[in-house]
Regions:
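Hydrophobic alpha-helix feature that most strongly marks membrane-spanning transmembrane helices
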Residues: 200, 204-205, 226, 230, ...
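Secondary-structure capping and boundary motifs in well-ordered enzyme cores
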Residues: 90, 119-126, 156, 160, ...
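Structured alpha-helical segments in the cores of large, soluble enzyme domains
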Residues: 95-103, 160-165, 188-196, 314-321, ...
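Active-site C-terminal subdomain of aminotransferase-like
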Residues: 251-370, 376-381
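A short glycine/serine-rich beta->alpha loop
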Residues: 26, 82-87, 113-121, 270-273, ...
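Non-catalytic terminal extensions of PLP-dependent enzymes
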Residues: 1-100, 104-111, 132, 138, ...
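Conserved PLP-enzyme active-site core in the AAT-like
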Residues: 7-12, 118-299, 304-307, 320
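A short small-residue
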Residues: 74-81, 201, 205, 324-331, ...
Length: 480
């Protein structure tokens, strides 16, 4: 047997000449002994080689580009736990400044020095906090009135992101869904009100629907809800899920009323790591005033050296994202954010217009209000096509593009769509490359003599396994 004892794999040995590189990476058990940092780094890095480049991932909403100074700041704070406010008091102050800035972007009426809000790991936790606050306010009022409080519900469109399903299950709150249709592509206020009753804790309109990219009309909902509450004597509030739109609307549509300018909007949540332009995970939630944040949501501990009060589902959380958000606010300012979001929107509109020119496709909506949109195969084209959008997804992935194909939610599940999310770091030149690859893929698919497996599955009404995460959640398989 060959003697390999001469190979110790120490720091002087070339990485690929080390004996550790002859062993597979650990799957079930921690290795018996240590290795050099160079080898460990290379092994972990090699595990990611088969992935797409993040900036070519048009499925994700998550920020995939920040400048070198932002990255440097965040790396320098990577070992700081935000919850240790006694040791890192300036981080806590910076967090408060970010909440102030976000709340004022949403036209907060609060006069206090520090606005009412909370840091979150992402928009999901922010949504949860907004929902829990609405539930606790409703429950407290019902208890004071001596009425039952065991059957709470909330109303939302079928375009909801998966966190709301989690919220309903975890807190045992009924989720009443208003169906989206081709005729009613956003939340219909009147249909939403039909689902309300004395047990409704809130209505949740969405700004930047994950599935479609559209915005619910919050102003119309607020107006209809005001009349409904006056008629019934209820005081059903609105929580706005602005995971994407919360950092788009203030800069591109400042005149549009969707925020705290509206009477019944009491809380708003947003993702900082989407169009807030910060690496994950970061989210924010703000309330119209302190009276709308129940005291029982604040928890205090003293084992960190002082009494620390926090609002959140998570306890420990990274401080680096706070620095990243505050840096972006200072670095870009209002005008800089406006320019970045404007460019993303214009590139999305450009791709939208080019997709409309392609024979097989039709866009779901005529306009693009956020930097994302969806399209599907024309029904007449799909009848004779030997391929599906799942096949186009696979073709594009061969060129590094991640463009998800998926079915729309309930009542629209017969429609398979594709979606593009344009983010900071995606240029017009990259858009042209994408469009070129789409055209080339279509040309190849149209040469097929026989139907693809996904096309045959569609014809037999069999489920097709979704191969790419679309950030909508809810389903592992789709019908068509």
């Amino acid at each position: 047997m060959e003697d390999l004892n001469f190979r110790k794999g120490d720091a002087k040995t070339d990485v690929f000449g080390s004996d550790r590189m002859l062993q597979p990476s650990p799957v079930e058990k921690i290795p018996d002994g240590p290795t050099t940092p160079e080898v460990a780094y290379q092994m972990v890095k090699d595990e990611t080689f088969a992935q797409t480049q993040p900036r070519l991932n048009l499925a994700t909403f998550v920020t995939t580009y920040m400048d070198e100074y932002a990255t440097k700041l965040m790396n320098e704070a990577i070992n700081i736990n935000y919850i240790d406010e006694t040791e890192y008091p300036r981080i806590a102050v910076m967090n408060g400044k970010c909440i102030n800035i976000v709340a004022n972007l949403w036209n907060s009426p609060e006069k206090d020095t520090w606005k009412t809000g909370a840091l979150a790991i992402g928009s999901s936790e922010a949504c949860m906090l907004g929902g829990v606050a609405a539930w606790l306010r409703w429950r407290k009022k019902r208890q004071a009135q001596g009425k039952p409080f065991d059957k709470p519900n909330f109303v939302i469109s079928t375009g909801f992101q998966v966190v709301w399903e989690k919220f309903a299950q975890l807190w045992q709150i009924e989720m009443r869904e208003v169906p989206l249709t081709l005729e009613k592509t956003t939340l219909d206020p009147e249909e939403a009100l039909k689902m309300c009753d004395e047990n409704t804790i809130c209505i949740v309109p969405i700004q930047g629907v994950t599935w479609t990219g559209l915005n619910d009309d919050v102003e119309a909902l607020d107006k209809a809800l005001d009349a409904y509450n006056a008629k019934t004597g209820y005081d059903i509030p609105i929580h706005v899920d602005a995971a994407s739109g919360g950092f788009i609307l203030p800069f591109l549509y400042p005149e549009k009323k969707w925020d705290f300018r509206l009477k019944w909007v009491l809380s708003i949540s947003v993702s900082g790591h989407k169009f807030g332009l910060v690496y994950p995970g970061l989210g924010w939630v703000c309330w119209k005033g302190k009276e709308y944040l129940p005291e029982e949501m604040s928890f205090s501990v003293n084992y960190l050296g002082a009494n620390i009060t926090q609002v959140g589902l998570n306890f420990s959380r990274p401080a680096a994202q706070i620095l990243g958000q505050y840096y972006q606010f200072i670095r870009l300012g209002f005008q800089g954010y406006k320019e970045v979001q404007y460019n993303s929107l214009q590139i999305a509109k450009y791709i939208h217009s080019e997709i409309a020119k392609m024979v097989p496709f039709v866009n779901y909506s005529e306009d693009v209000v956020n930097p994302l949109f969806i399209w599907y195969l024309k029904p007449e084209y799909a009848k004779s096509a030997k391929w599906t959008l799942y096949d186009l997804q696979d073709k594009l992935s061969q060129h590094g593009w991640m463009v998800p194909a998926y079915t729309l939610p309930s009542k629209l599940e017969d429609y398979v769509v594709m979606r593009v999310v344009v983010r900071q770091g995606f240029s017009c030149d990259m858009a042209d490359m994408l469009l070129g690859d789409i055209n080339n893929a279509i040309a190849e698919l149209e040469k097929l003599e026989y139907p693809t497996p996904t096309r045959m599955a569609q014809e037999k009404n069999l489920p097709v396994e979704a191969k790419m995460f679309n950030h909508g959640g809810r389903r592992k398989t789709v019908k068509k």
